[in-house]
Amino acid sequence: MIIRRASIIFTTIFFLVTMIFIFNYKDTIFALIFGILQFFILFSAMFFITGQWLRSINFASIVMFVLFMINRLSLYYYRKALFANDFLLYLDYENWDILIDFKELLLVVIIILFLLGFAIFAYSKNEKANLKLRMSGLISLIILVLVHTKIESLDIVKSEWLKTFPELKNTYMNISMTIGNNSGLDYKSPTFNNSYEMFKNKINTVTNYEISNLKPNIVLWLNESTLDASFYRGNLEQVDMFKGDFKFQTLNRVHTFGGKTWKSEFEVLTGLSPDEFGASSSLVFQYAAPHIKYSLPKNLKEEGYYTIALNPYPGSAYNSKNAYKNFGIDEYIHPNELKCDGAGDKIRKLKYITSMQMGECVKKIFKKYENKQPLFIYMLTINEHAPYNRAKEVKFGLNEFYDESQSIKLTDYYERQIELSKAVINFNDFMLSTNKPYIFAYFGDHQGNMGLKNNDVKFNNFTNPLNITGFYVKGSNGVKEIKNNLMNLSELSLMPSVLLELGQIKPNDFFKANYAMRKICNKVDDCEDKELLESYKSYLYDYLNAANK
């Protein structure tokens, strides 16, 4: 009797909380409608299966509560609202290592599983309704699903949903609008109303850069979770990798925070923003990659380059090997295949391989493929990724600026950045020693998730400062400098044309446009001329069919 009363109280609480979520968290009437529809779809499905009223109310309430909480977790760890197709990533066991990185998440998952268990099995001994009433549950389920499908397909609903970007506060509407065709699983290229004529005319006004037969070896190094730590509030000294002479340097807008590295990989390799793919922006490696017509590796291959990707994860992780192949990478290499230090005895996720060890791996690639030069090597290091729990004490006077939790995380972050800097400088010294033309570029895919706020970054003049990282290029004497102020904000999607210009490599039609946009505005999403911005995107997607192969 006591257990039953406790269960009823438990169910009542979840029902009331779920109703608060549905009726309170809405920016549009359609968000409310979708929340109500989802609740009654879940209720009807469970009632048809079990014929038990209380069990069905309990099930619908808890599942709706869990969806809301998963959305909060997504916002905290990835700074991204939950979409229905995100569950494809969450259910892929290759991505479950996040539970090891963030042990508090494991506890949350256990709690969620417990709640779902209670949602499914509680009140299973209650009296069941007769068959007619259960069939009414099936009929109402069918009607509700049809109504849901119809509403989500209406143009006015899509328009209202798009108005909620980028905040996307309507949890249940976001889920509804990313189910089925709206999710991008039935692939459709982005389109911008064929408004490309303006940009098409402007391209002809841009002076082309010098093209030669220099053909430098190119290394593009993704520094995981990296932003020059001296940009954070405090008195952290700038490490050596961000000092000295550069062939090019800039701050860039990126389209992810704290994770989902593949979004920045997609951007720097294709010259396209993942956000253009809307609800499927987190799945660009799975659903957009096969349709990409142009890419930096493809352009380089046309000019005689052999293209290689070095990744500390197996090729199955986030579909990376297949995606790289779609982008024109000739060969995918895991450090284990080269018997690199820290690579272990089999191909697996190397979350703790150091950046110095990854740099040594690239040196082995140069030796192994000496006869296939010029080489383009795309690599990424992982050691700088969260969680930042290795520091034993707060250092660098950070406790004067942050609470203890953030101070110790930033201490760990900075200590890892010091080691990364040593690896970067060491590798650049190696490239110098080859006595061959080279370009060595390195950049941050996103900032690390340390619980910092916008005002903890010294970017007062920029919106969304947590979505900004740096891009730095060193090179041999024959590589001519592109003069640029570091604080002149650009975008990661424009960086492929930087590498082509530095290498004096002939661009294809896509990267001619990429170069022109960089010269005209130097930004994409932050470009002040919104008419130019739309025309540029239309030129890429509507005129060149860049994502419609």
Regions found by a protein language model. Give the residues of each.
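Membrane-interface micro-motifs in multi-pass membrane enzymes
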Residues: A31, I100, N170-M177, H255-G259
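Generic detector of well-ordered alpha-helical segments enriched in charged/polar residues
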Residues: F34, L107-I112, K200, L269, ...
